[in-house]
Amino acid sequence: MTLPFRAMEDLGLDALRSRWTHPVGVAVIDSGIDCEHPELRGRVAESARVTPQEGGAFQVVRHPEPLSQDLFTQGGHGTAIAGLVLRVAPRARIHDIRVVNPGGILVDARALAAALKFAALHEDIRVINLSIAADASWSNEHGIRRWVDEAYRRGKVVVASLSNRKRQGPPVDFPDVIGVHGADLGAYGIRYGPCLTAEFQSWGDRIPAPSAGGGESLRGGNSFAAAVTSGLAALLLGASPDLTPFQVKSLLKEGALGQHEDR
């Protein structure tokens, strides 16, 4: 069953931007960001890198100043994600958490857990964006679920993209997470379907986004749909900082561009 569509503008994006009263940090757990891109310069609060330690542990090394472009960022995935968040929520502050290797692969559950722990405990972060694919076997490994739950308990909105793989890994299927997959909905469109693995569909087709090294390119897919949704969550929190993650999710449902049931 498909219910009547509602325009995303019903959320009042311009009105929300004008009502922004509170700083909102958005963690981009990804491949890293080209912080010198003209669209991102001065808008990244910090960079942090997840690094392996002896004995198989991982540690987050924090850098008060944003890191420059390196081998990790050259693919441009994290740069595009951060840029899309900021195009939706221009006054958000990005926290660059580098966890994906130069090949664009998340190689270890412990690395993801370390990144989630850092973001969950960070006082300045309210939204956590995960546009990365984790292995389906990781759901109960090495604290991933624990730190997603802790982030939710601390009032942080966790947004994750559906994997492009057949089997889904964490945390997109966790109940405390806003799961997103891409669709051709037009600029900033969003749709809700409670029976889907990823409950929300968001704009995920031919999206102009910043490219590492300057300029922009067209992007598409689940990752970028999640970034748009994270930007919408940041807008809501900037206008109403006392909102809980549950309330943010409910408001996104109410502003959805239509609701449907999985057939």
Q: Which stretches of residues belong to each language-model region?
A:
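C-terminal subdomain of the subtilisin-like protease fold in secreted/lumenal serine endopeptidases
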Residues: 1-5, 10-12, 126-130, 238-263
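Extracellular S/T/G-rich loop segment that most often corresponds to the catalytic His/Ser-adjacent loop
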Residues: 161, 169-238, 242
